[in-house]
């Protein structure tokens, strides 16, 4: 778990993932979206979140999107990767993979499928945070996840 202070501020858009008509990833179109956001002056990119189709993607596809985001950001702004998995163990594994490929941080979502009690949700976030040295952004979307992380 990272102990260093992170001061993310400004606009960090949740980037949509682009697909071809056969539902395969369109990495060129996704890259173009990201490059335009960078050109428009965003403060960072958040990829593989809800609008990034996280739960529809394989781990390999998520890592490809992260690589595209890193290229689009060009080291000028941080890239934050969404971690939304069905179990805490899967989330820990994805956090480690995101760290391995060089993201600047992760946006951790509550474990999927079942709503949890506040102490269970907190335990999930703590467990994922201890699996990596990356800073984490906590994702709170009560209507979708049935958990309020405030």
Give residue ranges: language-model regions.
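Active-site beta->alpha loop and helix N-cap motifs at the rims of alpha/beta catalytic domains
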Residues: 2-148
